[in-house]
Amino acid sequence: MLLFIILSVGVDAISYIQNDRSNDLCIIYEMTSFGASFNNANDSLVKLHRHMGLKYEICKIESNANALTQMQKCNCLYDDTPQIVVFTNFRKSSLKTLIGTENKCELLPQTTIYTPTVDIESEYFIYGNDVKICYLDKNLLGIGCDATDTTSWLDLDAGLPTNHAIDIPEITSDGFKLFAKYGDSFLCQRLMDEPKKQIQFYAEVDNVPSNDVIESSRSWASVWKVVKTVLHFTYHILDLFYGNKRATARMIEHSPLG
């Protein structure tokens, strides 16, 4: 089961979503615009369900909003759905970091200096925007920062306008302090490099995102496969479901996707 727990700072309770539906696929669409091209692809999936019994759940992630908070509404990421397929046409996507591994994330307090409790043997990253850090080990980057004055702190994401994943490369026993300008930034601890579910990532040509920000492990799940359009991605879903490329040709020939 994919684990992505969101914790609120200062709150011990964890909420889990129960979902008894059984799906074949969890389909994630991250798009800059959900227009006619998405509607055509969605119509094709409806026909697949009607004619061939494909069971699926669709999760729509808007690229101009926080992907991590949107993921929490996607039940099939957390239930027993065996396979996840992801499509994006957003070049700055962080979905490979967020979905391709198992992570535990805590919401950072807004405009408040926060000192997290961290495990120096673990890997961490920030998912957010406009977050500053002050390392408490003076031998590290951030030497000279005033722990009480955030204007002297290092900007982790200077110049980037959207929420995204940012690696924290150095973790020592001295720890660090964080300051988040906005209320939807998270500190995430990587629990496992390999997901328990089967996951495949697809990106629209000319909009292939960068690699996982931590990249401590490289596997088939961390490779973006390139497709021409979102409709071509739908054809790949058919191949994945039936395990036979000739199935796509038969479906196109008989026009249930058209």
From Swiss-Prot:
Entry's Gene Ontology cellular component terms: host cell rough endoplasmic reticulum membrane; membrane; T=13 icosahedral viral capsid; viral outer capsid
Subcellular location: Virion; Host rough endoplasmic reticulum membrane
Domain of life: Viruses
Residues that carry a glycan: N42
Membrane topology: Single-pass membrane protein
Record's keyword annotation contains Coiled coil: no
Pfam families, A to Z: Rotavirus_VP7
Membrane-traversing stretches: 1-13
Record keywords: Calcium, Capsid protein, Glycoprotein, Host endoplasmic reticulum, Host membrane, Membrane, Outer capsid protein, T=13 icosahedral capsid protein, Transmembrane, Transmembrane helix, Virion
Subunit text: Homotrimer; in the presence of calcium. Acquisition of the capsid outer layer requires a high calcium concentration inside the endoplasmic reticulum. Following cell entry, the low calcium concentration in the cytoplasm is probably responsible for the solubilization of the outer layer.
Function: Outer capsid protein involved in attachment and possibly entry into the host epithelial cell. It is subsequently lost, together with VP4, following virus entry into the host cell. The outer layer contains 780 copies of VP7, grouped as 260 trimers. Rotavirus attachment and entry into the host cell probably involves multiple sequential contacts between the outer capsid proteins VP4 and VP7, and the cell receptors.
Protein name: Outer capsid glycoprotein VP7
Origin species: Rotavirus X (isolate RVX/Human/Bangladesh/NADRV-B219/2002/GXP[X]) (RV ADRV-N)
